Amino acid sequence: MKRPNNRPTNTMSLILCLTLSSLCVSSQSASVHGKNFATNRAVKSSSPFVVLSPDDNVVSMSGENGYRSALREAFDKSSRDYDDNGEDVFSNEKRRLRFHKRRLRFDRRDQDEGNFRRFPTNAVSMSADENSPFDLSNEDGAVYQRDLRAPRLRFYSLRKRAAGGMEQSEGQNPETESHSRRKRSVLTPSLSSLGESLESGISKRISINQDLKAITDMLLTEQIRERQRYLADLRQRLLEKGKRSSGVSLLTSNKDEEQRELLKAISNLLD
């Protein structure tokens, strides 16, 4: 029998050992970019304000001594901000990291070494538009931060309107003058104003009905009086005409019988 060939197995094991050794060597080494340093484990949790530049010098570390020297080199410029009191560098490592990140974020002095962009905290001077009729920072004297205030809209919210203080500024602007509180109350009245307007409308309607009834009664009374005067005048004329004709024609001729009967009927009707 032939002996089994173990060369492929030996080759695979050799490749695996070389790979593991290279991984171990790479995990023990790290790099420092300028004064902003981070290990492979701490890169994910680093602050977004720590910006690494490709122009920075890369310092390789080998062992504990290289790491200590990198730490001292990274914080030698900011050592004036603390008091070491002769202690070791690693005793205040976390505090130094926190202070370094805070200084990168909030320091307003000129940073010649860093390539990050500083965000101004007082954004009123940059965001306030003097020509904009909707910016109230200069008119009301209030200071608004860009990250804390609402976006600029044409109309303000009801909460700001109810708080007051914007009525005067709205009246000064020609574009928002038509939407002031005084004119808006006419377009959209409240419940109390609706009730008052309803009561006033009812009272006006009642007064108008009463006036119409009084006018109608007065006209009817005048018509009745005019009719009574007309009938009295007509009766008086008929009576006078009958008296004048009765003395001449009624006694001398029988032709006037019909007229006499007619006059009697008219006189009885008028009486």
Curated annotation (Swiss-Prot):
| Residue ranges annotated as propeptide in the record | 29-95, 162-184
Respond yes or no to whether keyword DNA damage is given for this record. Answer: no
This protein's UniProt keywords = Amidation, Cleavage on pair of basic residues, Hormone, Neuropeptide, Secreted, Signal
Any matching Pfam family = ELH
Top-rank taxon of the source lineage equals Eukaryota
Regarding tissue, the record states: Bag cell neurons.
One GO CC term, this protein: extracellular region
Q: Where in the cell is it found?
A: Secreted
Q: Where is the signal peptide?
A: 1-28
Gene Ontology MF: a single term:
hormone activity
Q: What is its main location?
A: secreted
Which positions carry Lysine amide? Answer: 241
Instruction: Note the InterPro entries from the entry.
Output: ELH (IPR003424)
Task: Tell me which Gene Ontology terms the entry assigns under biological process.
Answer: neuropeptide signaling pathway
Disordered: where is this region?
Answer: 162-190
Indicate the family of this protein. Answer: Belongs to the molluscan ELH family.
Q: What does the protein in this record do?
A: ELH acts as a neurotransmitter locally, upon neurons of the abdominal ganglion and as a hormone by diffusing into the circulating hemolymph and modulating the activity of other organs. It specifically causes contraction of smooth muscle in the ovotestis and expulsion of the egg string. Alpha-BCP decreases the activity of a cluster of neurons in the left upper quadrant of the abdominal ganglion.
Q: Which protein is depicted?
A: ELH
Give the originating organism: Aplysia californica
